[in-house]
Amino acid sequence: MKNLIAELLLKLAQKEEESKELCAQVEALEIIVTAMLRNMAQNDQQRLIEQVEGALYEVKPDASIPDDDTELLRNYVKKLLKHPRQ
């Protein structure tokens, strides 16, 4: 029983570490996208936003991906492009 608990705690710690790493990657990408958008001319910025939105619109999600997940991704991309980090 102790071995099982120790094994589960180890797996939990590994998952937490993976989660932290993914969060750091997302934060880094947000910072980069924000910096790029801020340094673009307004018309270039708008063109990029339209291209990304167009690409998202054309993508047909896999049937195994829940609609909620797809909508979450679309909303997050929209938020990042239209309201970059402060």
Swiss-Prot record:
UniProtKB keywords: Coiled coil, Cytoplasm, Stress response
Entry keyword Coiled coil: yes
Superkingdom as given in the UniProt entry: Bacteria
Subcellular location: Cytoplasm
Coiled-coil zones: 1-36
Principal localisation: cytoplasm
Any one Pfam family match given in the protein's UniProt record, by short name: Anti-adapt_IraP
Any GO BP annotation: cellular response to starvation
InterPro entries, per database record: SigmaS_Anti-adapt_IraP
A Gene Ontology term for the protein's cellular component: cytoplasm
Function noted in UniProt: Inhibits RpoS proteolysis by regulating RssB activity, thereby increasing the stability of the sigma stress factor RpoS especially during phosphate starvation, but also in stationary phase and during nitrogen starvation. Its effect on RpoS stability is due to its interaction with RssB, which probably blocks the interaction of RssB with RpoS, and the consequent delivery of the RssB-RpoS complex to the ClpXP protein degradation pathway.
Family statement drawn from the similarity comment of this UniProt entry: Belongs to the IraP family.
Subunit structure: Interacts with RssB.
Identification of the protein by name: Anti-adapter protein IraP
